[in-house]
């Protein structure tokens, strides 16, 4: 209901849980599917988009790649009229997907929300992730949703982080738009 009030998507990340050794993955995935379906039904009544985030293998123990998460989302969505989509986080994609650009292209119909965070948990341009391909693909697909800058709390002050991020990303955005 808060998402409807603020006109923003509901973001699901770690909601899938971290399984302990010996826990039944198949059963856990069924429970999570049931929970997400219940949330999706309510979100459908309020018009709230849902974005489910694949998380890297160091933080979660299943649904790491965008390909795995798309398959899981397809299972979740099968009986639903209000569909669940993807939250694409380049930080996790850089660890789990062979190509960030290919993962974006493969997932276009499902993308609801995007996170830009560099490999060191800092602002784009402070680590090793090349954001240029992501910017090009998002521009080519005419993505109109939010791109959130996700930065670790202790990395920098937020105003400086926002300025540094835009200084780094603005030339890529301009170059991508010139290629249209």
What residue ranges belong to the model's regions?
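Histidine-acidic metal/acid-base catalytic patches
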Residues: 37, 63-88, 92-180
């Amino acid at each position: 209901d808060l998402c409807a009030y603020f006109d923003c998507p509901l973001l699901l990340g770690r909601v899938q849980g971290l399984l302990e050794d010996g826990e039944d993955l198949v059963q856990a995935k069924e429970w999570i599917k049931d929970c997400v379906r219940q949330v999706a039904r309510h979100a459908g009544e309020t018009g709230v988009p849902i974005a489910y985030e694949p998380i890297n293998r160091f933080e979660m123990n299943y649904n790491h790649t965008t390909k795995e998460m798309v398959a899981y989302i397809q299972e979740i969505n099968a009986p639903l009229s209000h569909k669940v989509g993807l939250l694409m986080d380049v930080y996790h994609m850089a660890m789990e997907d062979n190509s960030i650009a290919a993962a974006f292209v493969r997932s276009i119909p499902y993308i609801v929300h995007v996170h830009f965070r560099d490999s060191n948990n800092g602002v784009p341009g402070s680590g090793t992730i090349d954001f240029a391909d992501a910017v090009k693909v998002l521009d080519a697909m005419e993505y109109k949703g939010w791109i959130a800058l996700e930065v670790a709390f202790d990395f920098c002050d937020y105003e400086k982080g926002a300025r540094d991020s835009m200084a780094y990303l603005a030339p890529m955005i301009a170059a991508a738009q010139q290629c249209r």
